[in-house]
Amino acid sequence: MKCPFCGHADDRVLDTRVQKDGSIRRRRECLECKARFSTVETIMLAFPFIIKKDGRREPFSKEKILKGLQASCQKRPVSLAQIDAVVEKISAWVINRGESEISSRLIGKKVMAELKQLDDVAYIRFASVYRTFKDVQEFVETLEDAELLDFVDASNPQLSLTAMTFVESEKSTNHETDSKTPSPRTRPPGPLSN
């Protein structure tokens, strides 16, 4: 190991410890300048390339997944440790597949599956960006589809479609009535604010 202080190539190991994450920490001393420094040894993993929707290929990035999860879980009761655990689980899944290339669509589905177990609202947020809906109508239809709603517990839902249903019924009422006659606005059921 090259000394970071003088550049000399010879050193001796004073102490070796295995860390909780499986890496090895070594305390070293340069034989030339007697400076001490620490090194950490970890296994180098070869991540596959990601094939994007437009056909581009880019290296797998844990940071990108972390950033997407943090945005989806913003202001939700999800800890950073939980998010990190999901990132590590997805990374391990990607490596264990043993492929040199993997589609971004497949990774997106895996992220959605993990978020589905973690937090309902974060799952909906991620799905709304990942699925790239062309308009609100398509988003509402997808929400009504079992694919996105099968996770909502009927006894204690975190997400209510009442307001979305109300908006859709109001749109259809406006199309049926004369455009000169304004339709009366009503509120969806729920708590009133003063």
Curated annotation (Swiss-Prot):
Region annotation (Disordered) ranges: 168-194
Biased composition (Basic and acidic residues): 168-179
Cofactor(s) demanded: Zn(2+)
Gene Ontology biological process terms, A to Z: negative regulation of DNA-templated transcription
Cofactor note: Binds 1 zinc ion.
Top-rank taxon: Bacteria
Keyword line: ATP-binding, DNA-binding, Metal-binding, Nucleotide-binding, Repressor, Transcription, Transcription regulation, Zinc, Zinc-finger
unnamed zinc finger segments: 3-33
Domain ATP-cone: from-to ranges: 48-138
Keyword hit for Nucleotide-binding: yes
Cross-referenced PROSITE patterns: ATP_CONE (PS51161)
UniProt feature coiled coil, ranges: none
Pfam families given in the database record: ATP-cone, Zn_ribbon_NrdR
Biased composition (Pro residues): 185-194
Entry GO MF terms: ATP binding; DNA binding; zinc ion binding
Known function: Negatively regulates transcription of bacterial ribonucleotide reductase nrd genes and operons by binding to NrdR-boxes.
Family: Belongs to the NrdR family.
PANTHER family listed in its UniProt record: TRANSCRIPTIONAL REPRESSOR NRDR (PTHR30455:SF2)
Name of protein: Transcriptional repressor NrdR
